[in-house]
Amino acid sequence: MTTGKTAPRRLSIFGSTGSIGRNTLNVIEHLGGRENFEISVLTGNGNVELLARQARSSGARLAVTASDRHYESLKRELSGSGIAVASGKSGLMEAADRDADWVMAAIVGTAGLAPTLAAARRGADIALANKECLVSAGDLFIKAIREGGGRLLPVDSEHNAIFQVLEENQRHAIERVILTASGGPFRNASLEEMKHVTAETARAHPNWSMGLKISIDSASMFNKALEMIEARHLFSLNPDQIEVIFHPQSIIHSMVGYTDGSVLAQLGAPDMRTAIGYALSFPRRPKLPVERLDFAKLARLDFEAPDEVRFPALRLAHLAMTRGGVQGAVLNGAKEVALEAFIEGRLAFLAMAEITERVMDDLAHLPPAAGMDDVFSADRQARQRAAELMKLDLVG
């Protein structure tokens, strides 16, 4: 006689020590923890103490630090636990090969590309929080998902919102997708004021608690630019179907407009656990301890058209999508170098977009990527060219 109880789902979390990873473990705990889920792999970077605590408490079978120099520290932290330890690129690829039904891909940057692609090819369901997979290697990644047979479950709040309201049998009737943005700390700033922005003022996001780099990317709208490129790949859209609207309350996370004039939207309090929980439980909806909206208290929702003069990153996203090929990888690579220079005080806030566009123009001749080597080459060339331009002082 069978009890009817299903076996625990096997999960891996790439980037468990970051914000997305920590929230994922929080959601797993709320949804029954070890009774319903079996953690195969956790990966992190330099925070080995947190990674070790997570591995012990979750019962993970393998813990991986992306940095080889932290291998011995992680090994000491997990001594006697029975949890296997690995490190570096080979460790991340070992993590990708482990038997997990569902993978949270939350490693920040290009380091997450290879292991996430490998997990997709293996057929795992990919809960995607790594932007580079689609921005830099969108065509290759979508192909890997299709060949592997797994599902692609977006975790970014905007893309998760679209995923939730998208009527699968009505994709042909999609007229536009509208990504919302809070507008960040400089939504009402003048162009002159934005010329004098510092890293400290740029990090103050009005609605979300985030790290330094992502906060600055949000303030400059580069984060939204990357999300536009992601949306194109996720939902097979044309560039002219993707719009951005400022919505300072961050209650509507995105909208889908159809050919009959209908617009469907997903609303909710700004809490990443909603998107994570939906990706983890899809197609069911889990019960989560997140804030419930009180529309009487909310009273109003505001919207504004973004100004591409003050936020040129949005225009660069359209340029990258129109050109196609490896322009997404070039945009991202150049932006990363410009962002570091801004944080260090070597580059003005608005000059991040100037240098990124110059690099995109200089490398517009690069052919489409036939494989990951071409993606990494485009990224490397973009970073080198951005550094050269700053050294030559060709931008502000």
Swiss-Prot record:
Gene3D superfamilies: 1.10.1740.10, NAD(P)-binding Rossmann-like Domain. 1-deoxy-D-xylulose 5-phosphate binds at K131, S157, E158, S182, H205, S218, N223, K224, E227. It catalyses: 2-C-methyl-D-erythritol 4-phosphate + NADP(+) = 1-deoxy-D-xylulose 5-phosphate + NADPH + H(+). It is an enzyme of class 1 (oxidoreductase). Keywords: Isoprene biosynthesis, Manganese, Metal-binding, NADP, Oxidoreductase. Its cofactor is Mg(2+); Mn(2+). It holds the Pfam family DXPR_C. InterPro entries: DXP_reductoisomerase (IPR003821), DXP_reductoisomerase_C (IPR013644), DXP_reductoisomerase_N (IPR013512), DXPR_C (IPR026877), DXPR_C_sf (IPR036169), NAD(P)-bd_dom_sf (IPR036291). The keyword Manganese applies. The keyword Ribosomal protein does not apply. GO terms for biological process: isopentenyl diphosphate biosynthetic process, methylerythritol 4-phosphate pathway involved in terpenoid biosynthetic process. Pathway: Isoprenoid biosynthesis; isopentenyl diphosphate biosynthesis via DXP pathway; isopentenyl diphosphate from 1-deoxy-D-xylulose 5-phosphate: step 1/6. One of its GO terms (molecular function) is NADPH binding. Its EC number is 1.1.1.267. Mn(2+) binds at D156, E158, E227. NADPH binds at T17, G18, S19, I20, N47, N130, E132, G211. NCBIfam families: Dxr. Catalyzes the NADPH-dependent rearrangement and reduction of 1-deoxy-D-xylulose-5-phosphate (DXP) to 2-C-methyl-D-erythritol 4-phosphate (MEP). Belongs to the DXR family. HAMAP family: DXP_reductoisom. This is 1-deoxy-D-xylulose 5-phosphate reductoisomerase.
